[in-house]
Amino acid sequence: MVKKRLPSNDTVFRFETPGSPRKANVEASRSSTDSPSSVFFSSEAENGVEEKKKACRSPTAQSPTPSVEAESPDQKKIISLRSKSSFDGASLASDKNDCKTESKNDPKTERKKSSSSSQYKANMHFHKLFLSVPTEEPLKQSFTCALQKEILYQGKLFVSENWICFHSKVFGKDTKISIPAFSVTLIKKTKTALLVPNALIIATVTDRYIFVSLLSRDSTYKLLKSVCGHLENTSVGNSPNPSSAENSFRADRPSSLPLDFNDEFSDLDGVVQQRRQDMEGYSSSGSQTPESENSRDFHVTESQTVLNVSKGEAKPTRADAHVNRVPEGKAKSLPAQGLSETVGILHKVKSQKCPMLHHILIFYAIVVCALIISTFYMRYRINTLEEQLGLLTSIVDTHNTEQAAPSGLGSQVQFNVEVLCQELTANIVKLEKIQNNLQKLLENGD
């Protein structure tokens, strides 16, 4: 079957090759599906169909077979080249598929390697900066943030199992803060911007730090809470629920009380409701500053003390049970009460400064009003003086115009007066000489 098929295909090549040798080269570069070499590797059924088609052709196409058989070695070389090209194409396709699968797997491995390498570098940098942290303690996570002081110190917050550290380098100044996790007494969310909640407060017994510009505040807060497991889940002032003292007060109060006690407790309820409204107003406001939160904590502690005192006076029989409860709450929140006391002192100092500020502002307002009135008065006086000067200049002008006509006569009269004065002086001199001569004569006669 192969021997019969070769001449017929060779005839086709013979008619194409002598006319245009370039076409043979183009056909040699085609794929295996378009080249005649694919016919040689086809099934016997396809070969039978092709033989029938070739038998139907004209005898002129089959007549030059002897000459083609003479050229069969060249055609065999072409066929071998085509088979090689088809094999090379198949190998290239398989290589491309392998490259695609490798390229799909490469990004995942690269990401894992890059994340592990970045974590390793961050851990090394963390232990290099903070030598007090043991090298066996790995870094959990680092966050970019800024420490709020007189200016913002941009840096990084490092969190490990037992340490919370911050490092910043601004204007060549290194700022390092190391906070042991067990010494943290308060972790609170706060706002320094109007719209973006981006700040956290970390407080100890002695210090208080505000970290702002946190891109993922919630994740940072959760990680810090997990590290500081000794803290309570809710911070003071963040929950809108009533305080523990108020809850205990409402739980211990019986349903039926005398009329006098009802009046007293109604007053206390009004105070508590007012405090609660203040707390809700602070929590519903768009921006919360640390000062407002501090004042809110002070109000809560103040309301608790008022409730405790009033309850001790109204119900002496249950005072012992209530006193037993209060120290437990105080034992749990001793650092928070220490902070609230300091905040209360600051609040008192600020309240004392407020009247002085009011008096100074009133004094400055009075001075400004006096200056405004004096400026108006000076302006009025200047206008009146300008009017008077205008009148005087007009009078002088009219007087000059009136005296302009007899100016010639006046000059003549003045000239005559001067002449008369000169003559009179000359006569007086002569009279004096005569008098002197007469006196001399009289003296000589005597």
Curated annotation (Swiss-Prot):
Residue numbers of N-acetylmethionine PTMs: 1
Keyword annotations: Acetylation, Phosphoprotein
Domain of life, source organism: Eukaryota
CDD domains per UniProt: PH-GRAM_GRAMDC
Skewed-composition ranges (Polar residues): 234-247, 282-292
Biased segments, Low complexity type: 29-43
Chain intervals with Basic and acidic residues compositional bias: 95-113
PTM annotation (Phosphoserine): residues: 239, 256, 266
Residue ranges constituting the GRAM domain according to the UniProt record: 124-191
Pfam families: GRAM
SMART domains on file: GRAM (SM00568)
GO annotations of cellular component type: cytoplasmic microtubule
Record region (Disordered): 1-120, 234-253, 276-298
Protein name: GRAM domain-containing protein 2B
Species this protein is from: Pongo abelii (Sumatran orangutan)
Gene: GRAMD2B
